Protein backbone atom coordinates (compact mmCIF):
# COMPACT_ATOMS: atom_id res chain seq x y z
CA UNK A 1 0.00 0.00 0.00
CA UNK A 2 1.39 3.41 -0.93
CA UNK A 3 1.85 6.14 1.63
CA UNK A 4 1.28 9.86 1.26
CA UNK A 5 2.66 12.90 3.07
CA UNK A 6 0.13 15.36 4.47
CA UNK A 7 1.00 18.73 6.00
CA UNK A 8 -1.60 20.15 8.40
CA UNK A 9 -1.78 23.85 9.24
CA UNK A 10 -3.94 25.00 12.14
CA UNK A 11 -5.42 28.49 12.07
CA UNK A 12 -4.57 30.65 15.11
CA UNK A 13 -7.99 30.13 16.75
CA UNK A 14 -7.75 26.35 16.41
CA UNK A 15 -4.14 26.45 17.57
CA UNK A 16 -5.33 28.26 20.70
CA UNK A 17 -8.02 25.62 21.30
CA UNK A 18 -5.60 22.72 20.81
CA UNK A 19 -2.52 23.96 22.64
CA UNK A 20 -0.99 20.47 22.83
CA UNK A 21 -0.98 20.12 19.02
CA UNK A 22 1.77 21.91 16.99
CA UNK A 23 0.45 24.54 14.54
CA UNK A 24 2.11 22.62 11.67
CA UNK A 25 2.20 18.85 11.42
CA UNK A 26 3.74 16.60 8.79
CA UNK A 27 2.19 13.13 8.72
CA UNK A 28 2.79 10.10 6.53
CA UNK A 29 -0.33 7.96 6.20
CA UNK A 30 -1.63 5.24 3.88
CA UNK A 31 -3.20 6.53 0.66
CA UNK A 32 -6.97 6.47 1.01
CA UNK A 33 -6.97 7.67 4.62
CA UNK A 34 -10.02 9.84 5.27
CA UNK A 35 -9.77 13.37 6.58
CA UNK A 36 -11.44 12.15 9.79
CA UNK A 37 -8.87 9.34 10.15
CA UNK A 38 -6.05 11.81 9.53
CA UNK A 39 -7.33 14.12 12.26
CA UNK A 40 -7.55 11.22 14.69
CA UNK A 41 -4.02 10.11 13.76
CA UNK A 42 -2.81 13.65 14.52
CA UNK A 43 -4.55 13.68 17.91
CA UNK A 44 -7.07 16.31 16.81
CA UNK A 45 -10.71 15.65 17.74
CA UNK A 46 -12.68 15.80 14.46
CA UNK A 47 -15.46 17.80 16.15
CA UNK A 48 -12.94 20.56 16.98
CA UNK A 49 -12.44 21.20 13.25
CA UNK A 50 -15.22 22.98 11.41
CA UNK A 51 -13.70 23.24 7.94
CA UNK A 52 -10.83 21.50 6.12
CA UNK A 53 -9.40 23.38 3.14
CA UNK A 54 -7.20 21.90 0.41
CA UNK A 55 -6.03 24.61 -1.97
CA UNK A 56 -9.29 26.27 -3.01
CA UNK A 57 -11.53 23.33 -2.11
CA UNK A 58 -13.41 22.53 1.08
CA UNK A 59 -13.16 18.85 2.01
CA UNK A 60 -15.69 16.69 3.82
CA UNK A 61 -14.30 14.74 6.77
CA UNK A 62 -15.24 11.52 4.98
CA UNK A 63 -13.22 12.41 1.86
CA UNK A 64 -10.29 10.07 1.18
CA UNK A 65 -6.84 11.53 0.56
CA UNK A 66 -4.80 10.03 -2.27
CA UNK A 67 -2.00 12.54 -2.98
CA UNK A 68 0.61 14.46 -1.01
CA UNK A 69 -1.01 17.74 0.00
CA UNK A 70 -1.34 20.52 2.55
CA UNK A 71 -4.57 21.00 4.49
CA UNK A 72 -5.63 24.04 6.48
CA UNK A 73 -7.87 23.38 9.48
CA UNK A 74 -10.39 25.97 10.69
CA UNK A 75 -12.12 26.03 14.07
CA UNK A 76 -15.85 26.64 14.51
CA UNK A 77 -16.70 30.33 14.80
CA UNK A 78 -18.50 31.29 17.99
CA UNK A 79 -20.88 34.16 18.05
CA UNK A 80 -24.38 35.21 18.72
Report the location of each language-model feature.
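Ubiquitin-like/PB1-type beta-grasp interaction modules and other compact soluble beta-rich domains
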Residues: 1-79
